[in-house]
Regions:
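Membrane-water interface at transmembrane helix exits
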Residues: 50, 54, 87-91, 95, ...
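Conserved nucleotide-binding and Mg2+-coordinating catalytic segments in signaling enzymes
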Residues: 210-233
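Extracellular-loop-to-transmembrane junctions of the mid-late helices
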Residues: 2-12, 113-151, 185-191
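Transmembrane helix-loop junctions in multipass membrane proteins, especially transporters and channels
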Residues: 28, 56-63, 91-94, 119-127, ...
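Non-cytosolic membrane-interface motifs at loop->transmembrane helix junctions
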Residues: 63-73, 127-138, 194-198
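Alpha-helical transmembrane segments in multipass membrane proteins, preferentially the mid-helix core
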Residues: 18-23, 84-89, 142-163
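Hydrophobic alpha-helical transmembrane segments of multi-pass membrane proteins
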Residues: 7-64, 68-85, 101-121, 171-186
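Interfacial "cap-and-anchor" motif at the non-cytosolic start of specific transmembrane alpha-helices
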Residues: 2, 159-213
Length: 233
């Protein structure tokens, strides 16, 4: 299973690297949008590597316990930040909305909470024998993850509505797929498919947003004529 997972992670990292290159070379994205996508892809890659580290060091000699704790902390802590990066991408304007600032503050508070509760093993624990285990309050991580995904879904639907985009309903099956995959991962933690699915969905989300933004005229910022004709028809 470990060898299979390592191969999947290698493929995962290749796809993310390609998406980073594609984002940097894009002529349709502004600097803010490029920054958001690049940060999202980088975070997914980082968390994917952290998951590999946790698998390698779990059950290893106690000298690696600190690495096991650190990798799990960063993995659990940074996960809700991925949807926030994608929300940041949605608005082409440089002004950051208050609700987004509040969401970032919640992420910061969550990181502090996670760090403060490490000695008590509320969300997760690593024994003296260097064995990982979920804590009694593991649901806090799950709640933060789902809350971030819900925020992304709502923000995407609201943005797509402004484009009169008939494909805006596609965000629901994407979110449903990710939610179902997360439930499977929680029920069967040995599968390790979460971040492969997140990578796939981030690529689909990139395509979805690109199609949506391409409906705008580059000069006026309004729906282009071809889109207007289709709306009338």
């Amino acid at each position: 299973m470990d060898r299979y997972f390592f191969i999947l992670t290698t493929i995962d990292l290749f796809v993310l690297g390609f998406m980073c290159l594609l984002t940097r070379l894009s002529e349709s994205l502004n600097k803010k949008q490029k920054r958001g996508f690049l940060l999202a892809f980088a975070l997914i890659a980082c968390i994917s590597v952290l998951e590999v580290i946790t698998i390698v060091v779990d059950g290893a000699p106690p000298g690696y316990r600190w690495l096991n704790i650190l990798s799990n902390y960063l993995g659990f802590g940074l996960t809700p930040a991925v949807p926030l990066c994608l929300v940041y991408v949605l608005d082409k304007k440089s002004i950051i909305r208050r609700i987004f600032k509040a969401a970032v503050c919640c992420e910061g508070a969550y990181l502090l909470f996670l760090a403060a509760t490490l000695p008590y093993g509320l969300v997760f624990s690593v024994s003296r024998e260097n064995l990982y285990a979920r804590g009694a309050y593991f649901y806090i991580y799950v709640a933060m993850y789902y809350a971030a995904m819900l925020y992304l879904m709502v923000a995407t639907v609201r943005t797509a509505a402004a484009f009169q985009n008939r494909s805006r309903m596609l965000i629901y099956p994407l979110t449903l797929f990710l939610g179902a995959e997360t439930v499977i991962q929680l029920a069967l933690p040995a599968l390790h498919v979460t971040w492969l699915c997140v990578t796939l969905l981030s690529v689909l989300y990139y395509i979805y947003c690109s199609e949506m933004w391409n409906q705008l005229d580059a000069l006026t910022g309004l729906l282009n004529q071809n889109r207007d004709r289709k709306s009338v028809v």
